[in-house]
A protein has these predicted regions:
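Intrinsically disordered, low-complexity regulatory regions
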Residues: 1-82
Length: 82
């Protein structure tokens, strides 16, 4: 008897972007950034992306990336650019 494996769809539904409740990271990104514009949407989206996937992909590296994008957003807001 052979083991049947479901091939991961790494383009449309990569496992490191799937959350335990059926949502995918893209669902959260779209909901949160829907009312944001330009660089603010990009920065917030990247913060969320790296936080959502850190435990399944690159661990501390992803948390540092999230921190980098968050720091950039904070800097822009402090300068009145957002």
């Amino acid at each position: 008897m052979s083991e049947k494996r479901v091939k991961e769809d790494i383009i449309n539904h990569p496992s490191h972007y799937k959350l335990g409740n059926g949502l995918e990271t893209i669902d959260i990104l779209e909901a949160v950034t829907d009312n944001l514009k330009g660089p603010e949407a990009v920065l917030v989206g990247n913060v969320l992306k790296y936080i959502c996937r850190y435990s399944k992909k690159n661990g501390l590296e992803d948390l540092k990336k999230a921190q980098w994008y968050l720091n950039r957003l904070v800097d822009k807001m402090e300068k009145g650019e957002q």
